[in-house]
Amino acid sequence: MILLHFVYSLWALLLIPLINAEEFTPKVTKTIAQDSFEILSFDDSNTLIRKQDASVTISFDDGETWEKVEGIEDEITWIYIDPFNRHDRAVATSMYESRLYITNDQGKSWERITLPDSEKNISSRGCYIETHPLNKNYFLAKCNYCEKTEVDNEENSGDEEGAPVIFNITHCTDKVFASNDGGKSFSEIKSSLERNENSAISISDCGFAKTGKDSDLESSDTSIICLFQNMQLIMDEFSSPYTESKLVLTTDWGKSLKEFDQFKDKVVNGYRILKSHMVVITQGDRYNDMSSMDVWVSNDLSNFKMAYMPTQLRHSMQGEIYEDAMGRIILPMSRERSDQEEDKGIVSEILISDSQGLKFSPIPWTANEVFGYINLYQPTYLKGTMIASLYPLSRRRNRKGKAKGVKNKGVTKISVDNGLTWTVLKVVDPDNADSFDCDITDFENCSLQNMFYTREGSTPTAGILMTTGIVGDGSVFDWGDQRTFISRDGGLTWKLAFDFPCLYAVGDYGNVIVAIPYNADEDDDPQSEFYYSLDQGKTWTEYQLETTIYPNEVMNTTPDGSGAKFILNGFTLAHMDGTTNFIYAIDFSTAFNDKTCEENDFEDWNLAEGKCVNGVKYKIRRRKQDAQCLVKKVFEDLQLFETACDKCTEADYECAFEFVRDATGKCVPDYNLIVLSDVCDKTKKKTVPVKPLQLVKGDKCKKPMTVKSVDISCEGVPKKGTNDKEIVVTENKFDFKIQFYQYFDTVTDESLLMINSRGEAYISHDGGQTIRRVDSNGETIIEVVFNPYYNSSAYLFGSKGSIFSTHDRGYSFMTAKLPEARQLGMPLDFNAKAQDTFIYYGGKNCESILSPECHAVAYLTNDGGETFTEMLDNAIHCEFAGSLFKYPSNEDMVMCQVKEKSSQTRSLVSSTDFFQDDKNTVFENIIGYLSTGGYIIVAVPHENNELRAYVTIDGTEFAEAKFPYDEDVGKQEAFTILESEKGSIFLHLATNLVPGRDFGNLLKSNSNGTSFVTLEHAVNRNTFGYVDFEKIQGLEGIILTNIVSNSDKVAENKEDKQLKTKITFNEGSDWNFLKPPKRDSEGKKFSCSSKSLDECSLHLHGYTERKDIRDTYSSGSALGMMFGVGNVGPNLLPYKECSTFFTTDGGETWAEVKKTPHQWEYGDHGGILVLVPENSETDSISYSTDFGKTWKDYKFCADKVLVKDITTVPRDSALRFLLFGEAADIGGSSFRTYTIDFRNIFERQCDFDITGKESADYKYSPLSSKSNCLFGHQTEFLRKTDENCFIGNIPLSEFSRNIKNCSCTRQDFECDYNFYKANDGTCKLVKGLSPANAADVCKKEPDLIEYFESSGYRKIPLSTCEGGLKLDAPSSPHACPGKEKEFKEKYSVSAGPFAFIFISILLIIFFAAWFVYDRGIRRNGGFARFGEIRLGDDGLIENNNTDRVVNNIVKSGFYVFSNIGSLLQHTKTNIAHVISKIRERFGNRTGPSYSSLIHDQFLDEADDLLAGHDEDANDLSSFMDQGSNFEIEEDDVPTLEEEHTSYTDQPTTTDVPDALPEGNEENIDRPDSTAPSNENQ
C-alpha cells in the first residue's frame, strides 16, 4: 500500500502541470480597425506599426493597444521597416510629391525628408528609400516621374467614377537621389544616357554595392552601381521595345560615372548584388525583350565572366535571384508571356550555380519532367535543407479550356545535403493512415505534395515545420482538398495536424504554434476560431472567437521567433459601417504557470540526421516535446552549433567546370564546357590532365580527398582569341530516331516539337539545347497538327483516343477525349478567327476500315476540344470559309466536301449554321477543293474525263476559271494550285501525265482568279502533282522553275526528261535561263563556255526532288539570298554530280560555294549562313558572316555523324541552329542533335534606327548594281554593312524604300486572256479565237454602265509604273447591255449651256475680227493694200499702243497665211509625184516598215524617241513621215513624165537614225500596221 500510495502521489505531481496546461488560456485582445492589411514588427522590441487608411498607427505593447503616430502630417501610401536597421528605423512614403517620413527610434518621432522638386508638368508617382547596411546616414532615394496629361474622360476614363488620368505612363522617367547626411540634402545621380524624343520610358536603378554587413564583395562603402535604360515604344512592327542601356559605377555620389567596359555594346537587362557575387543579366537582342539572356558573374566588381547556362534564359526573375549559405546563386526563371493570364509571372524553372557562380544546372529531378510551376524553399536556419515542389501547368485550376483526363504528376521533394540527394516528403502517421487515399508506407507513390513555401518570412525553429498540401502520387491536386501537416525533423517526415488548410505561425522556437483555418466553417461552426499547441504540434486546443473573420495573416511579434506573442489580422464583410478589420493580440507568455525551461528540459537535435553538410555537423538545442515550460529567451536568435568534419568526402566536392555528372552521379568531361574553358589554351599537347572534382567554396571539412586527374582531349578544341572559341555547341544523344519536328513560329522563344520513332513527344524551348518529354499518359502519339492561324497552338493525337493540345508552344498541355469514333488520320480544319474552334474527322461504324458501313463524320468543337458535337455525316474535308475571305457573304459559312456511302461521287455543300438547319449544295459532283490566299478553288469533272475549275472570293458567287486556249493543251485532266499572292493565282495545268514524264504549263490568273494566261510551257512536275516552281521569299515577282527542254520527245516516249532552270523577275511575263558564274569555287573556269544561255547556263534541282519541302532556296528574312544544288551546263545533272551555288542579288548572278551537294540554313536574316555536307559523314560545318564572300569551317563534334537535316526558327532570325545527325556506335547507331549557337562570335549588335533611317551599320542599296526598274519602281533595301555585328529581331525585310516610280515599259505588261506572247515579244491573239467578250464584265458587276475592249495586254498587278508605254490603254467605251440610256446620259452634253457658250465665243470672235478690220485694214487702205504690206513697213497708221498691237496682228496674219498657201501648193505637187511613182512601181517591192514590239530596250526608249524631245527623235519622226523618201539619189528624182527608178533593197547601217539603240536596225524596215498608235507614244 505504501508503494502504491507513493506511485499515486508521484503521478499526481506529474499530472498537475498537464492540468495547468490544459486549463491555460492565452490572453486575447481585440482591436477594430479600418483598411489595415499589413502589420510590421521592429526587431527585438515590442513595437508594431501598421498603415490604417492613409495614416500610420503604432503599438508599443505587441499589438494590444494602438495609437496614431504624431509628426506625420501627410497622407501615407506605404510604410516599411529598414532591412538593415530593423530594430529602430522605418520609412513612410507620402501621397504628396517628393516627401517621405523616417523614424530612427521605433516610431516615437518622425522626421520629414524632402526630395528635390520635379520639373513643371512632371508628377512623382512615389519614392522609395534604400539604406546602407553599414552607415545609417547613407540614403538612395528612387522616384518615378511621369508627364501630367489630362485625358478626355469620354475616351479614356481614369477610373470607374470618370476621374481624369493625370499620368502619361508612356513618358515616364526614373530619378535617383543620393544623400550622405541622413537625408538633410540630396543630389541627383543623373543618367548618362541622353533621352531623345523617341524615348518613352527612362529607367534609373541604383543600389549600394554593399548589400549586407557580411558582404564579401570588394567595394568601398560609397560604391554605388547604377543601371540606366531608355526604352522606345514607337514602332508597331516590333513586338517589344527597343532598349539602350549603360551600367556604371560611382564612388563620389554621382559626380563621376565609370561605365563597365564589358557591357558597353550590350543591353543590360538588370543586375543583382549578392553577398559574394554581382550578377548582371544582358539581353541578347535589344529589339526583342523576349530574347535569350546571358548571365555574367563577378566577385570584385571589375572582372565579369559569362556563366554557362544549360538552357536559354528568357524570362529571369531578377528580383528573386539570391545566394544560399554555400554561396551558390539561385536563379529562378519565369514562364514566358502566356495566353493564359493566370500563368503570367510564375516560376517555371530554377537553376542553381556551382559555388563559383559560373556553371548553372537545373534541379536534377525536374530537368526532364513535365513543365510547370516550381517552388524552392531553403530555410536559412536549417543548413543544407532544400524543399522543392513541381506543379504541372496543365493542371492549373480554372484554366480556360481545361480538359478532362489530365494526369500530369506534380511532386515535392526534400534534400538535406544541398541538393546532392533528394527524397519525397514521407508521411509517417499511423494514427491517421486510414484517412488517406493511398498507402502512406509506399513512399514513392504516396507522399506529401505542397506548393506554398516561400523563401522569405520563415520563422527560425529547431526543425519544426508546418505546411499545407495533399497526400498522394501527385496526379491529383485540388486546392479544396488541402490539409495541414507538421514535421519535427526538418521536413523529412510529416504528420497530419488538421483536415483543412490553415494559416500558421510559431513562437518560442517552435514550442508555441498558432493555426487558424482559412474557412471558419471547416468545423461546422460558422464562428471563427484558432488552434494552438504548446507541445510542438502533438496536441491542439481550440480558442473560439466571437466574430467570423477571413484571416489575412498570423505572425509572431518577434521576427526571430523567440517570443510567445502573436498577431492575428483578419477582416469581415458583415459590418456595414466600414469597420472591417479585426486585429487580435494573442499572448502565450504566461503558459505553464510562467515557467522557464531548465537545462534538463532540452535535447540535442541534429540536422541532416547527423551527417556532414558543408564539411560541418550541425545541431540545435531544443526543448523536449513534453516539457512543461517555455524557453523564454526573447530577442535571442536561435543558436546553431557546428563541428567541423575530419575527413572530406565526395559530398564536399562538386564537378570542375569542364565536367558534368552523368546518370550515375560521376563527373565526366563535357566537350562543350571544355571549349568554353581555357584548359586547352595552355598546352600544345593533344591531351591535358584536369581534376574532375573541386572543393565546394566555403566547405569546412579538414582533410581534403585525393582527386586524380583525368586526361582531356584537346583535339579540335578552338584556341583562345579565335571566333570559333565563342561558338557554343550542345549535344544530345538518343536511343531512338527523331521522325518529325516542327518549330512554333514565334519570336518569343525557339520552341519546337519532336516525335520519335516510338511515338513519344518531346518539347524544347531553346532550339533543342534542352529537351523534355511530353506526358501523354502512356499513349503513343500518332499525329501532330499545328494551327496555321495561331502560331503557339498545336494538337497531338494519342493512340487511345486522346487529344493533347497546347496554346503556349508546349509549356503546358491539356488533354481531352476525342469523340467515340475511329481515328482516320485526316488533318484538323481550323477557324482562322477563333483559336478554339476546329473540325475533327472520325470514322463511324468502323469496326473495320473496310466495312461498308464505315464512313467519316465531321465533329465540331468551339472550346478547344473539351466537347465535340456531330456536325455533318460523310464529310471528309471542311473549311471555315467565312473566316478565310476578305469580304465573305457570311462570316459563319462552312463548306464541306461530302462523300456518300452509297456513291463514289463527292459533292460540295455549305452552311451558315454548322448544318443545323441550313444546308446548300454548291456542286453536285466535284473532284476536290482547296483554299488559298482568299480564294476557294473547286475542281469539277467535265465530259471526256476533263476537269473544270471554279473560283469564289466570297463563298457564294462561283466563276469558272477560263484556261487559255493553246495548241499544246489537250484535256484538262490535272492541275496543281501553286500559290496565291497579291491578287493572282499561280496554277500548273498538266499537259502530259505519263508517270515519270509529267510536265505542263504554268498559268497565272487575273485578280479574281477566273481568267488565266500561260506564263511558261513544259514546266516540270512529278506524278504526285508537285511542281518545280518556287517564288523567292521577300522579293516581288522572282520565280524559279525547271522546264523540260525536250518535252516533245519526252511526250513521244523517245527520251528521258532533260531539265533546265529558268527565272523571271516580273512574275512570269519574261523568262531567262540562269547566268552561270565565270569560275567555280576553286577559281577554275567551267567546261561549258558558250555565250548562248540556251547551251550553257546554271541549273538547279527543284521542289519535286526535296526530302523536306521546308528546305527552300530562299528565306523571307535574307532578302536576295538563295542557295541551290545544281550544275553549269546544257541541262541539269543528277544530284550527286552537282555543286552548291549561292546568290545575293535575287538570282541575277551566282557563285559556286561548295563542290558537292550541301544542306543550308539562314540565320540572323542572312547575317550568318551555315552549310553542312549532304549524304556524307562529317564532323564540321561551314559558316559565313559576310554574306557568302568567305567561308570558315568549324568542328562541332568529336566523332563524325551523318547529318540528316539542319534547321532553325522559321523566320531565320535566330543565331542558333539545330542539326539532326546519326552516328555509328557499337552494336548499332545513335541519333543525336547538336545545337550550335553563334551569338558570341559577334562583337556587338548592329546599331539600328527604329525609324528605318540609315546608320553606321545599315545602308540602303539596290538588290544588285544592275537593278533598274522592277514592277514599275526602283527599290532599295536596308542592309547590314558590318559583318562584326549581328542584326537580331528587326524585321529588316520590311525596311525598303521606293526611289521613284518608273515609266511603263513592255516588262510592266503581260498578255491578256486569249492572247499569247509571240517570239517577237508581242501579245498576239490565239489563232482562230476572238478576244474574250469584254461585255462579260457587265454581268459580273451589275452596277457598271460601260466596258472597254481588250488591247491584248494587261498591266501586271504588282506594277506601279506611271506614264510611258500604255499597252493596256482601253478602247472607246461601249454601253453595257441594258445600260444604253445611262451611258448616253453620261456622255451627252446639255444643249442649253453648250449653245450659250458657243454663241458667246462666236460673238467674241466676231467683235475681235471687226475691231482688227476697222483699226488695222480699213484705216490703212482696206484689202486693196493687203498684198502690199510687208514686215517692218512704216506706212501704217499708229497713233497709240492699240494701233501698234492691231498692226502687228495684221502683219503676223499676213505672214502666216502666205506661208500656208505656199505649203499647200508644194504639198499638192509632192502628192501628185508620189502617186505617179507608186502607179509605175507597184508590185516591185514593198516599202520599209517599222515594228513596235520587237525588243524591250527599243520600246523602253520609244516614248522619248517619238515625242520630239531631242534632235534624234525629231529625225526619226521625220523619217517615218517620209518613209518613201529615204536613200533616193538626187538624179533619181523624176519629173511628172519620167519613169521612177528603183532604190536599194536594204538600208545600210549608216543610214539608221542616231536615236536607235545599237543592234535594233532590223526593227526599222517596215512601217506597217504594227506601229504603235499615238496614244502609246
UniProtKB/Swiss-Prot annotation:
Residues making up the signal peptide according to the UniProt record: 1-21
GO cellular component, one term: membrane
Major site of localization recorded for this protein: Golgi
Keyword Glycoprotein listed: yes
Record-linked SMART domains: VPS10
InterPro entries xref list: Sialidase_sf, Sortilin_C, Sortilin_N, VPS10, VPS10-sortilin, WD40/YVTN_repeat-like_dom_sf
Pfam families: Sortilin-Vps10, Sortilin_C
Region (Disordered), start-end ranges: 1531-1577
GO biological processes: Golgi to endosome transport; Golgi to vacuole transport; protein targeting to vacuole
BNR repeat spans: 58-68, 101-111, 179-187, 414-423, 485-495, 531-541, 762-771, 859-869, 1141-1150, 1183-1192
Source superkingdom: Eukaryota
Protein topology in the membrane: Single-pass type I membrane protein
Described function: Functions as a sorting receptor in the Golgi compartment required for the intracellular sorting and delivery of soluble vacuolar proteins, like carboxypeptidase Y (CPY) and proteinase A. Executes multiple rounds of sorting by cycling between the late Golgi and a prevacuolar endosome-like compartment. Binds the Golgi-modified P2 form of CPY, and this interaction is dependent on the presence of an intact CPY vacuolar protein sorting signal.
UniProt similarity note: Belongs to the VPS10-related sortilin family.
Designated name of the protein: Vacuolar protein sorting/targeting protein PEP1
Source organism per UniProt: Saccharomyces cerevisiae (strain Lalvin EC1118 / Prise de mousse)
Gene designation per UniProt: PEP1
